Amino acid sequence: MLRQVIHRGLKASFYWLGLFVSRHPVFFLTVPAVLTIIFGSTVLSRFKPETDLEILVAPTHSLAKIERSLANSLFPIDQSKHKLYSDLHTPGRYGRLILLARSGGNILELAEQVLQVHKKVLDMRVNYKGFNYTFAHLCVLRHRDKRCLLDDIITIFEDIRLAVLSNSTFSKVPVSYPNTTLKDGRVSFIGHQLGGVALPANNRDQQVKFARAIQITYYLRNLGPVVQDIIAEKWETEFCKLVHQLATDSQELHIQSLTSFSLWRDFHKTGVLAKSEVLVSLVLVLLAATISSSMRDCLRGKPFLGLLGVLTICIANVTAAGIFFISDGKFNSTLLGIPFFAMGHGTKGVFELLAGWRRTRESLPFKERVADAFADVMVCYTMTSSLYIITFGMGASPFTNIESVKVFCQSMCVAVLVNYFYVFSFYGSCLVFAGQLEQNRYHSVFCCKIPSVEYLDRQPTWFKTMMSDGHDLSTHHDSVPYQNHFIQHFLREHYTEWITNTYVKPFVVILYLIYASFSFMGCLQISDGSNIINLLASNSPSVSFALTQQKYFSNYSPVIGFYIYEPIEYWNSTVQEHLKTLGQGFNKISWIDNYFHFLRVVNISASTKSDFISILKTSFLRSPEYQHFVDDIIFSKNGAEYDIIASKMYLVARTTEKTREEVVELLERLRPLSLINSIKFIVFNPTFVFMDRYSSSIISPILTSGFSVLTILILTFFLVINPLGNFWLILTVTSVELGVLGLMTLWNVDMDSISILCLIYTLNFAMDHCAPHLYTFVLATEHTRTQCIKISLEEHGAAILQNTSCFVIGIMPLLFVPSNLTYTLFKCSLLTAGCTVLHCFVILPVFLTFFPPSKKRHKKKKRAKRKEREREREREREREEIECIEVRENPDHVTNV
């Protein structure tokens, strides 16, 4: 009883809302238009892009950020970033080059050309307020001699050039890999500076004879003042221009560059590239909506209502964008999906309202028809809009650890709210005016009076076709004009009969088993998309640089800083063995290993604290080949003696081309050791900030959204008229969600911020389209399930087809935007629409004929009502016979009357 009361109360509320809108159409048309003008004007004036890529795509809360703060407090990262090599996420300002020998050549034979490029970079000038700045003014300085810090590969190539100039070959310069000894005696790790190395099979000393590429990084100071950063930014811009020119002019070298702003530039480039495609998408959706809303009936066709519906959602999106920027929001390229997602939800409400209008009785006044359409449609549309807000609201909650996902979900919630208001206000007003025109028999396109039948009979055929309403004027109130819509006609006359055919059902079951098996297979192969390349423009310099880097410089992992942040007894043999165990399997760049090697060479023992620290400070750190280790140790003076309170060393692991996955494994292996080990240490690399707990962070929004929807649908079991509707909706949405997840994985889509947002949208898109379909079936009172599913398809099939076709047509232009982000958005959106249509038109119509709810009780009720009516007719007949007998027996009385 409570369920019926709630349902009737909601329908009555929306009926009165429809009446209110129909009585004040000008007000509800004007207010949204004024709001759009007010908020839309702020889009251009307050538009600001988000410039910090780390804020957007890195997990907001992670141990890596805490470890970075601790490491930076001990050893400033800006001073040691040249040792903490990271492939794409080097902190601060910098410029990086990859020089690749063309035609498979040996880069070691091109030392002169490499050094010429290097010299041009050093000589490049940047003008700021009349002063010229070069790299020497901006570079990171070495502590020992205050000279610019350069990669050791430059020193090696200078030695090779000198050897060539002295009529020797480059092979005379000993270059080992990955560790090589320089002329000053220092041992340097060049695994990330020399790439594509081929070592002879019988080469015991690892001497390099052939290499394909070198990588040079120019580190800039980060002093803090705004002026310094502006000059550094200008230097990076000029650096990119210079490299582009050198790459064009060079015949022997293929040159690529990367700077600190390159990733952001190519991430933001997606939004710039997609401008024209978004406009094309809008035009295509307008055409599709107009055509799909048309009928041959010029009185009831109303193609402009489809067009006005799309325009309603467009101005709603403009208003939502204005609200976003007024609240200090910053644009990023992931927000590109909001117009498409909002259009997919908004046009569903528009087409359902249009279908509801056409189902109303034409004999009613147009205001009551609008109210009936609201009562018929807005209950379900309100429910699905509420679920949109709940799911995306959970995505915007503190449980979400990715800022780009949180910003997107917040914006989507605002867009859905504004869409909902505009659909019942602006579009409701359009429906009122269209109804008034229809009631006064005005043409749906030309807005002129439709001539009488007698007048049309005297006109040519083309005029009759354009001006005829397609119905006999004397009988059009008794017909159902909506059934003449071409989609409705196809569903009623052809599709419903075919899909419910007994011989079709086995093939549908087989199709679903194939669908489920492929989905399950894909779900077992899910991989996280922590690689930032998935979000960049596909033909951008950053993507080309990253692919070259992965091909030639992926033999070794990023350099992992190993920071010991508490005093330990370095002179103790047990501690030394412990440190060796921790670094086992890594290529180490360690002051302590070099110190023990130094002690062995000079044949000195340092088994006590005083000897260990005394020799370390007075001999080891003053030797030219070991001076660079001064920055790796922090001493404290306690009275007359010194203590080592912290130190660091660097670890590098051997990897394959799947570097990112292996780095995540390294982090997961080392971090637990730091928590349970007696030596208190942390490990850090700038890449860890983007990779630490990324998988769990990116999955949590869809888990919280899915759990919230499941909870809501279960809690409302006792509030809806038939709980089986909720049960079927849960099963259907789960099937669609898992199908999209599995199939997108098979389509090479990783779990990144875009794909996870698409999965949240899939939940809502499936509910938006399946809920009216399922509830109509559950509440139908026909004799059989087959008849009920036919009625459900006839009522909602046209709106589902109209909306999904407009949605798919709208996302098609995204395929032509050269960006990995839009490719992901297109793939996931296409799978979402495809799986939803498959369930609405193929799987559900067949499976609902097998399983509950049963329609026998309705059949029994109808049989009982029919028997009751037969009894009433029998009694009526008996009364008539008695009256006839009385009339025959008393004719005089009848005559007198």
From Swiss-Prot:
Keywords: Cell membrane, Cell projection, Glycoprotein, Membrane, Synapse, Transmembrane, Transmembrane helix. Residues 856-866 have a biased composition (Basic residues). It holds the Pfam family Patched. Residues 867-881 have a biased composition (Basic and acidic residues). It is found in: Cell membrane; Cell projection, Dendritic spine. The chain crosses the membrane at residues 25-45, 271-291, 306-326, 335-355, 377-397, 414-434, 506-526, 701-721, 727-747, 754-774, 806-826, 831-851. Residues 273-433 form the SSD domain. Its main location: membrane. It comes from the Eukaryota. GO terms for cellular component: dendritic spine; membrane; plasma membrane. It is a multi-pass membrane protein. Residues 856-881 are annotated as: Disordered. Glycans are attached at N132, N167, N179, N332, N572, N603, N803. InterPro entries: Patched_domain-protein, PTHD_SSD, SSD. Can bind cholesterol in vitro. Belongs to the patched family. This is Patched domain-containing protein 1. It comes from Danio rerio. The lineage of its organism: Eukaryota, Metazoa, Chordata, Craniata, Vertebrata. The gene is ptchd1.
